[in-house]
Amino acid sequence: HALHPETPMHFFWDKQDADEVTKVDATLSFHQIDDVKFLNRMAGCRAYASTAGFESICEAMYLSKPVLMVPAHIEQDCNAYDARQAGAGIIGESFDLESLLRFAGTYVPNREFIRWVRSCERQIIGELERLADQHSAVTVPTLTNYFPI
């Protein structure tokens, strides 16, 4: 933050005794975790930095936001690797705002991912209809169900 004081930064945390919003200065704020507020902030941001949690990286990809991922454990390492392969962003050893801003300048969103997400309702309904068709055939009970042989 000290190197880029002009860049607004919003962080979300679950600090027990903190206010709803802790404003450090004009461009640095900490917010209590709130799903709706988080997504609204992400929708309006220029770029996103994360420890590479699966959901937030997918949300950033859907919203066409470049991502800096700094994984903290093995599951996040795997998420970061997959996300980088999908074009979501870059992986760093630390939260380096300069790297994120530089990447944001060249970022190209993965439009195929967005199309895939938007197709999920159609795919799910199609699969449910296919399964319903398989199970809707009339079965006629055999006599062995009623009389022991």
Predicted regions and their residues:
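Short amphipathic alpha-helical segments and helix-helix/interface helices
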Residues: H1-A2, L39, A80, I125-L128
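Donor-nucleotide binding loops and adjacent catalytic segments primarily
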Residues: H1-A47
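Anion (oxyanion) recognition and catalysis
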Residues: L3-P5, M61, R84
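Short acidic active-site motifs
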Residues: V36-F38, S99, Q123
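A donor-sugar binding/catalytic signature common to diverse glycosyltransferases
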Residues: K37-N79
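Nucleotide-sugar donor-binding patch of glycosyltransferase catalytic domains
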Residues: P66-V108
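C-terminal amphipathic helix plus adjacent low-complexity
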Residues: R102-I149
